Amino acid sequence: MIEDKDTKISDEIERREAEDTIAALTGQVACPADKCESKNPHKAGFVNIVGNPNVGKSTLMNDLVGERVSIITSKAQTTRHRITGIVNTPDFQIVFSDTPGVLKPNYKLQESMLGYAQGALTDADILLYVTDVVEDPTKNADFLARVAKEKIPVLLVINKIDLLKTNGDLEAIVARWKQILPNAEVFPLSAKEHFNVPNLMARIVELLPPSPPYFGKDALTDKPARFFVTEIIREKILTNYDKEVPYSVEVIVEKFDESENSIHIMATIFVERDSQKGILIGKGGSMLKKVGTEARKDIELFFDKRVYLELYVKVEPNWRNRENKLKAFGYIE
């Protein structure tokens, strides 16, 4: 027991030393959770999260919101829509938006995804630009140049610092990014480990403009329940399949019948080719059954109800490049 206690004390000392190092690099001062709420008048604002694919934007969003509103996988382009997560206290409301990673589009769906990221630059009160400790700062220079010209507060989040071996490595990374975004405040953190995220949250609260809330105080998101069902199913496809199949998939909920204790859901998975349909279903339907089981369990956790899930697969040729289908699937207004 003595060794366990000593280990915990040692870990806490290391954590505090790391926080002191970050404070010295960035000028931030740690803020206890119960001291971070703003005072009257009420504050509210839109905080948009942008950056390249696979830097941890969705992980950060979920950590800031305190709920799993964005799906997370190791694959790039997991986020296709602009997803809202809302944080409420008596003193403030923060409307976070997670956006697709910035990319050079190869088809119309990706053009729509890029549009969400670009649009996030136009309607934010505060902008979070997320990168990580391995990303090349010159990637997508045109988008970064637009971020650098923003007149609103820009917070540069350097994620995944738990992967670094020395503080010197962090100093070099911060210095490189400050050359590109000289006016941004820098927040090195690990969203996965929840390290330094409270300091980021505290600064966001400080920067919020005075405003009444934009949504009801019990709101978590502006997305309907069906949206989260489709995202959970798509997440299971992304984690169970490789190559082009997960990127060729769209999910539509055809039926969502909710009673007091259960939900009956019927959803269609669209792919672009017959060969993809065969791969998705698997031998004897084994793969589709696996996806359905995994999705059903997560949907039950999300809604805290028993779920009956039926999945069907249909072919919709080249839907990612067809404007009418992108409108039908909610990517284009």
Regions found by a protein language model. Name each.
Residues 70-72, 139, 212-216, 239-250:
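Active-site phosphate-binding and catalytic loops of NTP-dependent enzymes
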Residues 153-155, 162-221, 225:
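Canonical P-loop GTPase G-domain recognition
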Residues 56, 196, 287:
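Conserved glycine(s) of the Walker
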Residues 91, 115-184, 257-259:
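Conserved C-terminal guanine-recognition region of P-loop GTPase G domains, centered on the G4
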Residues 79, 102-104, 136-137, 164-165, ...:
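Catalytic P-loop NTPase motifs of RecA-like helicase/translocase cores
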